[in-house]
A protein has these predicted regions:
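Membrane-embedded alpha-helical segments of integral membrane proteins
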Residues: 29-71
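N-terminal "domain-start" segment that seeds a small globular fold
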Residues: 101-112, 216-240
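Sequence context surrounding c-type heme c attachment/ligation sites in exported
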Residues: 121-133, 165-169, 194-197
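Gly/Gly-Pro-rich "capping" loops immediately C-terminal to redox-active cysteine motifs
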Residues: 125, 137, 141-172
Length: 241
């Protein structure tokens, strides 16, 4: 978890730096990720072996940089330190590129600004029922009345799928749609004239809350982490929190 959070924070920091330099303009209200790829932090959770390789490689690079720094400050014994740094880089257990990097979009690192409030979830439910239920189904299981007519059957949104994607990339898919490998559209996008950015975030909040509830109903456990909705609580003393 610490490795995942550290790598994600590093990417967020790089984006903030580029935004400050004017190299990452605002897109949908937040700084854009300006690169075609990003570090696939979600793979660190899925593949423990890959996570170990990433951690060990980072340690090797860190020790190699330390050896080079010491060699610069030292007048003696520079060559052994250089050889040590080179050996660490050469023999580091580098992770496979296709596991380390994944294609990115401008909103990949965007984070929901809604606060996951109860009101926002209710608003998102209304948006879903108006714009999404025909394809994804009333229970979000991908079996809506129009699903069979699509080029690709809609996914079941009641499982762990939403936790395997970054919020910003889910936002992009709702806003801009999806295409199959052959370029054919598999899901239409909803432009700014159809849904506001706030509505897109709210429907994603609703889907996550709904999926968590469905998994709890089926398994009796919270299989995936979900935030507690921000709600006002009225205590017996009449105080609101």
């Amino acid at each position: 978890a610490a490795l995942l959070e550290g790598l994600q924070a590093t990417q967020q920091g790089l984006r903030a730096l580029l935004h400050g330099l004017g190299l990452a303009p605002d897109v949908h209200g937040q700084p854009a990720w300006p690169f075609a790829h990003r570090v696939a932090v979600e793979m660190l959770v899925v593949d423990a072996g890959h996570a170990r390789r990433v951690l060990l490689s980072l340690l090797c690079v860190g020790v190699a940089l330390l050896a080079l720094a010491v060699s610069v400050a030292s007048r003696r014994g520079r060559k052994p330190l250089w050889w040590l740094a080179a050996a660490l880089v050469v023999f580091a257990p580098w992770p496979h590129r296709h596991l380390l990097l994944t294609p990115a979009v401008a909103t990949s690192l965007h984070q929901s600004p809604t606060g996951f409030t109860a009101q926002g979830i209710v608003h998102g439910q209304a948006v879903y029922q108006q714009h999404c239920v025909r394809c994804h189904g009333a229970s979000a299981n991908g079996e809506g009345p129009d699903a069979a007519r699509l080029a690709m059957w809609p996914p079941n949104l009641n499982g762990a799928l939403l936790w395997k994607r970054l919020d910003g990339e889910l936002f992009w898919r709702v806003r801009h749609g999806m295409q199959g490998r052959n370029g054919a559209q598999t899901m239409p996008g909803f432009g700014i004239t159809q849904l506001t950015d706030a509505q897109v975030w709210e429907v994603l909040d609703y889907l996550q809350a709904h999926a968590a509830g469905q998994m709890l109903r089926e398994s009796g456990t919270w299989d995936r982490p979900v935030r507690l909705p921000d709600v006002a609580v009225l205590c017996r003393q009449g105080r609101q929190h």
